[in-house]
């Protein structure tokens, strides 16, 4: 998860509030100090932190909780709302025909982001093309072409042509039939005058619907200087913050952008083509505080087009085979890293803490389960009850695991089957269908 340290510290502050017997000035002051410390360690601007602290304190001590909400819940909700206000609501890039120009310094992850952004739109049903107008950096053409080829995205570039505005113009002509056209531009190691002029020249040719500034999260509060400089040059309409999963300064970058007239459109949270997320402040803060992001989880399932032929009607009658369980593990594997998926799930409002070691153990256990099921016969997968001691030994040998782990898998399957049977009374067939659909299942 992005900003692990910040999220952990903020959750610690909220847990104090949630476990308190009463809300008073001492409790609020203590929680505010913890929040201040967490934000400052994440490189958020001191003035912004103090302003946020004052608003939280003022509201927590003077506002009356709305009907149906106790004082503790109200204070937690205030913190949630004010954190959203701190980082801004985000820039909405609609799913429609458009041209997008990417700008930014060298090393910001701009080229990789161009391919990720193209993948984002293409997976949502839009024909997408990428134009390489970076004629400055050696290897930019080859890198971007390879990334696009890997994802099946149309690529346009002119190797050897150093006239970036001309390449951009030719690229637009060659990609007229595409819905979304993404123009990748050159960067420099600093805000040099020739870089700014080239951006202006390309902008004059491209006339993009959106000009997105790509920034490395590690620059922290310096993000505001970049945003202002590029905004003056081309009038940027949004920001993409990359590498947010690998720095403690991400809070500074997020808040610095919000301090300017622009806002964040996307965030990069990993290395794969799907690790670019549309930025929505409420969902981001919800995940940061451990409240989950079910909407994001559903979108992730839909994005990788998870399909399964699980028979929902049979499941509702109590039939949940090991084959069904295997399909669910396969679906989870497609959706991305286990830690990222689990952090989209809500756990009691404030979240639970799992160490990296615990996540790794869980991941290895699930992988072992798949190996075990790969060593079973179709008959065993359909009817686990026939798996006796001798079969367990054979399956363990075939999968390179211990018999105890095979038994553990069978117990886990039995528990899941029991839970599904329990849904029949409380959830109902239609609601079960809706749930499966929301988790990426096709209609049944």
Swiss-Prot record:
It is found in: Cytoplasm. GO terms for cellular component: signal recognition particle. SUPFAM superfamilies: Domain of the SRP/SRP receptor G-proteins, P-loop containing nucleoside triphosphate hydrolases, Signal peptide-binding domain. The keyword Glycoprotein does not apply. The keyword Transferase does not apply. GO terms for molecular function: 7S RNA binding; ATP hydrolysis activity; GTP binding; GTPase activity. Its EC number is 3.6.5.4. It catalyses: GTP + H2O = GDP + phosphate + H(+). Disulfide bonds: none annotated. Keywords: Cytoplasm, GTP-binding, Hydrolase, Nucleotide-binding, Ribonucleoprotein, RNA-binding, Signal recognition particle. SMART domains: AAA, SRP54, SRP54_N. GO terms for biological process: SRP-dependent cotranslational protein targeting to membrane. Its main location: cytoplasm. Part of the signal recognition particle protein translocation system, which is composed of SRP and FtsY. Archaeal SRP consists of a 7S RNA molecule of 300 nucleotides and two protein subunits: SRP54 and SRP19. Involved in targeting and insertion of nascent membrane proteins into the cytoplasmic membrane. Binds to the hydrophobic signal sequence of the ribosome-nascent chain (RNC) as it emerges from the ribosomes. The SRP-RNC complex is then targeted to the cytoplasmic membrane where it interacts with the SRP receptor FtsY. Belongs to the GTP-binding SRP family. SRP54 subfamily. Composed of three domains: the N-terminal N domain, which is responsible for interactions with the ribosome, the central G domain, which binds GTP, and the C-terminal M domain, which binds the RNA and the signal sequence of the RNC. This is Signal recognition particle 54 kDa protein. It comes from Methanothrix thermoacetophila (strain DSM 6194 / JCM 14653 / NBRC 101360 / PT).
